[in-house]
A protein has these predicted regions:
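Winged helix-turn-helix DNA-binding recognition segment
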Residues: 26-87, 135-194
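Short helix-coil-helix linker/hinge
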Residues: 10-19, 116-124, 129, 133-137
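Positively charged, structured surface patches that bind polyanionic biopolymers
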Residues: 1-17, 28-38, 54, 89-118
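Cysteine-centered metal-binding/redox modules
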Residues: 22
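Single-residue recognition of alpha-helix capping/boundary positions
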Residues: 16, 43, 111, 120-123, ...
Length: 198
């Protein structure tokens, strides 16, 4: 089973994770590093077609692909050699500074396929958030709220539609066997969710 090392950053509101995960799925092996971190392309049209081939419906236009390749927010995920038409993913966590090792989320083929099939970049961001904080905890759990996730990620924690979406995501992730949720009361008597990655 192949694992994918996704650089993690909470401030993900402007990140199109459908685009990012598609690049990870397309990556070929770099013979020097033995990592799946290399995407070669002939033209922007060719690259856009490759990215869109991972979805039932197109998620990008050629203009959007061009813009994303130039956009600073995606620098954390890859570097682009426009002369040789090669994208190199920044997924070599072993070469990162020790303080940055935990800035990765590791997902497998099953998780990648599920997240891409969701066609929902907010769901992807939410799952990576849970996985990041659970995956590197000795107890493999996180005690959090929808508002905490939204606030950390740059969304409005007061927006009712986002709160409702997170509730839906909890059910979807739980029903599909990715998380387990245990409800508990805090010291003030407020109900909170305790999340476990399965």
């Amino acid at each position: 089973m192949r694992n994918y090392y996704i650089p993690y950053d909470e401030k993900c509101k402007k990140v199109n994770y459908l685009y990012v995960l598609s690049l990870y799925k397309l990556a070929e092996v770099d013979k020097k590093t033995y990592l799946y971190n290399r995407i070669s392309y002939d033209t922007i049209k060719d690259l856009t077609a490759k990215i869109n081939s991972n979805y039932k419906e197109s998620i990008l236009s050629e203009a959007t692909t061009t813009r994303y390749l130039q956009k600073d927010i995606y620098n954390r995920f890859y570097s682009v050699d426009t002369d040789n038409k090669v994208i190199t993913l920044k997924n070599n966590f072993q070469k990162q500074n020790i303080d940055r090792i935990n800035k990765f989320v590791i997902i497998n083929d099953k998780e990648l396929s599920f997240l891409m099939a969701s066609n929902d970049t907010l769901l992807i961001a939410y799952y990576l958030y849970l996985k990041y904080y659970c995956g590197y905890s000795s107890s493999n759990k996180i005690d959090t709220t929808a508002k905490q996730f939204l606030e950390a990620s740059g969304y409005s924690p007061k927006a009712g539609n986002y709160i409702s979406k997170i509730s839906d995501y909890n059910k979807i992730l739980n029903d599909n066997g990715f998380i387990k949720i245990i409800k508990k009361r805090d010291n003030n008597g407020n109900e909170r969710n305790e999340y476990y990655i399965l």
